[in-house]
Amino acid sequence: MTAAPLRLHPDRLFPADPDTRVVARRLYAEVAGLPIVSPHGHTDPRWFAEDAPFGDASSLLLQPDHYVFRMLYSQGVPLEAIGIGAPVDPRAAWRVLADHYHLFRGTPSRLWLDWVFHSVFGLDVRLAPETADLTFDSINEQLARPEFRPRALFDRFNIELLATTESPLDPLDHHAAIRASGWTGRVITAFRPDPVVDPDFEGFAANLDRLGAMTGEDVGSYAGYLAALRARRAAFAAAGATSTDHGHPTAATADLDRGEAERLYAQVRGGGATAEQAELFRAHMLTVMAEMSIDDGLVMQIHPGSFRNHNADLFRRFGRDKGADIPTRTDFVRALRPLLGRFGNDPRLSLILFTLDESAYARELAPLAGHYPALKLGPAWWFHDSPEGMRRFRRQTTETAGFHNLVGFNDDTRAFLSIPARHDVARRIDCGYLAELVVEHQLDEDEAADLAVDLTYRLVKSAYRL
């Protein structure tokens, strides 16, 4: 069987209307070569600290990417067959992906992976069962070369800044090694306190003990707990962090008085909290984190509304982040009011909101961000950082929030090699949307070109204080 060619059309994702497409091409030409600013993501800082060669195609492109393996699992492929939870021959795992690559037609994963195959590795045949070994061998051969090591790819991808995400319990040794190495690539961390502010996080009590040991603070008291959090925030800022990130089940906030907070902390610290008390503690700690952000200047991100680890059996067998997180309906208007009542009018706070509940875009999020000085909207996230998801986001938020209450794009990925592809998709979608506004005579083309640069580069640097 003849292998199908792999081509990337230069007009991919541009509007189908010919007149609009011509404008989109011109706008895209203004931003295609701009540096990548990636202010939020989950790549491994060890890669850039050690700069060791990546192992093989499967361990790099398949096993870390839950977008990919959740689709395979949905079609009955055991995770063990691709090397998750059990050792497997990397070539055999790659053949599994090739055998099922047709599942990704019409998905953003197909766009990203095809870009990686074509633009990073120079492949000119589509991944399929008959090309599995050819592509596997070609990728592995290239990964052994110096120009495919993490730092070389970072430079080749024209990345100006890349933020990873770490727990307060992380000693940040890899970030220290990056800074000490003399390499000029800018890789910074971000503060993700979920393991020590969410009573439902596995090992919460032990995590608090580790937090106390790391900081020398007495986390047996609420005052010592807050002091320990401040100490770790300061350590993260010293390591280059400009932001925090909070992955709570809901966007609930609360503003407890000191006595209430102390009693609630004692309850969750002791392990006897009810579900309602755990939610109240998370809610209160978001408000506390906002106050700390005003003090230390760290931008605050909230990523709520994911039902984590929905597949209990999969979580028991493989742990978290295995493709079983599901979007939920999320309230923002009532949930955020306690926090916004304290700090929403303070421009020193920069609070970036994300959602998996698209129904909230126009009804809640755009009106909130279009009013409160402290609020901005993050881009389409996770299940929605797709071409259609990005278009829906633009159409439902721009009229109320404008462009400058948004923060540009972030890729939020573990898949390092897909970062340029994800940013390219966002640039193409934004240029297509702006081209529509030009053709409809809502914007002049010079304004659209200026906005294209804002959405690609300037807004993200401003919002994340980079």
Curated annotation (Swiss-Prot):
EC class name: isomerase
Lineage top rank: taxon: Bacteria
InterPro entries registered for this protein in UniProt: Metal_Hydrolase, Uronate_isomerase
EC number of the protein: 5.3.1.12
One Gene Ontology term of the molecular function aspect: glucuronate isomerase activity
Record's keyword terms, sorted: Isomerase
Pfam families noted in UniProt: UxaC
Residue intervals passing through the bilayer: none
Pathway(s) per entry: Carbohydrate metabolism; pentose and glucuronate interconversion
An individual GO BP term: D-glucuronate catabolic process
Keyword Translocase set for record: no
Keyword Transcription found: no
Gene3D superfamilies assigned to the protein according to its UniProt record, in alphabetical order: Metal-dependent hydrolases, uronate isomerase, domain 2, chain A
Catalyzed chemical reaction(s): D-glucuronate = D-fructuronate; aldehydo-D-galacturonate = keto-D-tagaturonate
HAMAP family: UxaC
Family: Belongs to the metallo-dependent hydrolases superfamily. Uronate isomerase family.
Record protein name field: Uronate isomerase
Species annotation: Rhizorhabdus wittichii (strain DSM 6014 / CCUG 31198 / JCM 15750 / NBRC 105917 / EY 4224 / RW1)
